[in-house]
Amino acid sequence: AIAILLQLIYPLVDGEFLRLLTINVVYWGAGAMLLHALLAYGTRYAITYLFFTFFFALTIEHIGVMTQWPFGNYSYSGDLGLKIFEVPLVVPFAWIMMAHPVLTAARRIAGNWVFLYGGIALAAWDLFLDPMMVAEGRWTWVVTGAHVPFQPEIPLSNTFGWLLSGMFL
């Protein structure tokens, strides 16, 4: 409930309050998803989900920042707080917040295609998220090739990176 309430005021604020709100939405959302994982699937699943998703996200984001693959040439600003291996700590928790509901939905509707549904859903979430975060200066890309339609500041390779990493996760 707290994560939802925080999101309701999101369009009404700016500046430092918005920066702190952004971070809190992610942590509270991740906490809600972990609580759901615990209550719906048990302790073992919740702990496995937490650690696997956290380390996968931290690893793929670190690779992305350092090598420009698979998301393109990007960097995070200092606005998102403490960084681990050039990745803000809040970023793996954003993956935790989104991957669990995607996995839960995919298992219910996608049958043997869970991996594809998961990749598409996470890429779609990123298409929603990136324009806001770029506009707020949370991260930036150097775009040298094709870009996301109507979003010249976001390379198309980022969407494919999310599709690929989402399918793998």
Q: Which residues does each PLM region occupy?
A:
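Aromatic-rich, lipid-facing transmembrane alpha helices and their immediate juxtamembrane interface loops
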Residues: 1-169
